[in-house]
């Protein structure tokens, strides 16, 4: 409801009527419904990744395979394509099919200035892009997103995380020179060693200039 007050909202769901009954009285002129089957709720991970290419809005549609084939993703992997076929996006938006490359939105973090932050644990997972080495992954991402550099975190995890250490649960850019991150100060906690190592890695990162 708070989002609708500020932005137009796209809702993908199996049953529009059920969602309307939960939302109640809102400004539905700001809501776009698209009914389709889904597996889960994580639009950040299965949804298209948007960029501007010489001022033209582009949506990359990567493969979503349920966080490394842990969960069913047969419906979620089709959502972005179905949205395009259903004329959901503006006419100037260009869809680009990025198959067979597997990539979730939550596995990468950008400062918007040419630097991308990610984790080795996730992107190098054998259940995603199993035949690509880290250098090949880096070259591919730099080419696709027009990056100057990629910062790889080798440490950091959260218990119960099924994503293989998505960076969006560990560290996020606040600006091009500031990163907020998860910290653990309890030496008895199972996360202490890994998050301390991650903190040291982050301290070694420098600005591009």
Task: Please state what every model-predicted region is.
Residues 1-209:
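The feature marks the mature, well-folded catalytic cores of soluble enzymes
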């Amino acid at each position: 409801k708070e989002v609708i007050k500020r932005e137009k909202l796209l809702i993908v769901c199996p049953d529009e009527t059920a969602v309307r009954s939960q939302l109640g009285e809102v400004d539905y002129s700001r809501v776009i419904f698209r009914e389709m089957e889904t597996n889960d709720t994580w639009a950040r991970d299965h949804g298209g990744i948007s960029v501007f290419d010489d001022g033209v809005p582009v949506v990359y549609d990567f493969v979503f395979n349920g966080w490394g084939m842990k969960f069913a993703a047969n419906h979620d992997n089709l959502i972005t394509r179905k949205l395009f076929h259903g004329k959901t996006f503006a006419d100037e938006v260009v869809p680009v099919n990025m198959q067979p490359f597997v990539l979730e939105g939550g596995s990468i973090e950008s400062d918007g200035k040419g630097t991308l932050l990610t984790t080795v644990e996730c992107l190098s997972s054998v259940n995603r892009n199993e035949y690509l080495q880290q250098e090949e992954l880096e070259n591919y991402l730099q080419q696709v997103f027009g990056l100057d550099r990629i910062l790889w975190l080798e440490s950091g995890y959260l218990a119960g995380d099924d994503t293989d250490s998505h960076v969006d649960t560990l560290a996020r850019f606040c600006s091009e020179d500031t990163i907020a991150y998860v910290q653990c100060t309890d030496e008895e906690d199972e996360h202490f060693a890994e998050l301390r190592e991650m903190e040291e890695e982050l301290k070694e990162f420098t600005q591009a200039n």
